[in-house]
C-alpha cells in the first residue's frame, strides 16, 4: 500500500486566518471541502485526516507548529506512518510568484521560505514536491506583507490560484505523472 501526504503550510489561530502566509491552509480547506473530509486527527502538533483507499492511504494535513517549524510535523507524521519523501506534496505561499499564479516543482531549495526550509532540513532532502502559490513581492516589510490579508482584487486572483493548486493536488493523488502536472499547471 502506498502512502501519500498533502500538507498545506500556514499559521494556526484566528489572527492568521486568511493572511497571505496561510494560502497553504486555504488550499487544504478547498481540497477537504471538495471531498467532504474533515481534519479529525490531532497528532504530532498538527491536524490531519487519513483516507484509506483500496491501494493507497492518503493523509491531508495542516501543521499547527507555526510556519517556521513545519518540518517538525512533516517529519513526525512521515516517520510514524512510513510515508516516503517522494510521496509528499507541500503547498505554501511564495513572494517570488505573482499574485494569482502557481508554480509546481518536483524539488529544489527553499527559496527563502521558512516553512519549506524547515521541511527540507528535518527531512534531510530537497526532493520534496511542492506547489507555490504567489502572494507577490512586499513593498516594504516582509513580515508585515505575509501576515496581512489580501486586497479585494487580489483575493479573487488568489482564490483562482487556490482552486488550481487544489486541482494539482488531486492529480498528484490520482497518480498523474508529476512532470505532466508541472507542464499543465506551470503556464
UniProtKB/Swiss-Prot annotation:
GO BP term (any one): protein quality control for misfolded or incompletely synthesized proteins
Discriminates between blocked and unblocked aminoacyl-tRNA (site feature) positions: 11
Function description: Hydrolyzes ribosome-free peptidyl-tRNAs (with 1 or more amino acids incorporated), which drop off the ribosome during protein synthesis, or as a result of ribosome stalling.
EC nos: 3.1.1.29
Pfam families: Pept_tRNA_hydro (PF01195)
Domain of life assignment: Bacteria
Record: residues binding tRNA: 16, 66, 68, 114
Molecular-function annotations in GO: peptidyl-tRNA hydrolase activity; tRNA binding
PROSITE patterns cross-referenced by the UniProt entry: PEPT_TRNA_HYDROL_1
PANTHER family, A to Z: PEPTIDYL-TRNA HYDROLASE
Lineage: Bacteria, Bacillati, Mycoplasmatota, Mycoplasmoidales, Mycoplasmoidaceae
HAMAP family, per database record: Pept_tRNA_hydro_bact
InterPro entries reported for this sequence: Pept_tRNA_hydro, Pept_tRNA_hydro_CS, Pept_tRNA_hydro_sf
CC per GO annotation: cytoplasm
Organism listed in the record: Malacoplasma penetrans (strain HF-2) (Mycoplasma penetrans)
Identification of the protein by name: Peptidyl-tRNA hydrolase
Sorted UniProt keywords: Cytoplasm, Hydrolase, RNA-binding, tRNA-binding
Family: Belongs to the PTH family.
